[in-house]
Amino acid sequence: MGKQSSQRVFSQRQLRVGELVKQNLGELFIRNEAKIPNINSKLITVTEVRMTPDLKTARVYVIPLGGIDMRETVSALTEYSHLVRKALSKRLDIKFLPKLTFVEDNSFEYAEKIEKII
């Protein structure tokens, strides 16, 4: 399932770096700095970034806005993650730039299902 099934506790360092990556990815997408072909990155929302304990991998949860196909967006981001990572490296001054793994954020769909049940 989505990010709801994870019950892990994250360290303050993981949370801090994850938030830093999230903010910079959001700005990067708004300004279209990654230049991803066939994707309007201004319509991509980064909802959460989860870092591994060694801070070398980041799971980036995204939602495309404006009726754009989520699977298509995530596959394009995955295919061109090297461009996103390169653009991110210009913004962040951290020891290791994390490998980015893009994931569909289904939390809003999950919330809708719960609301319908209630």
What name fits each language-model region?
Residues M1-T57, I63-I118:
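Charge-rich, low-complexity N-terminal segments
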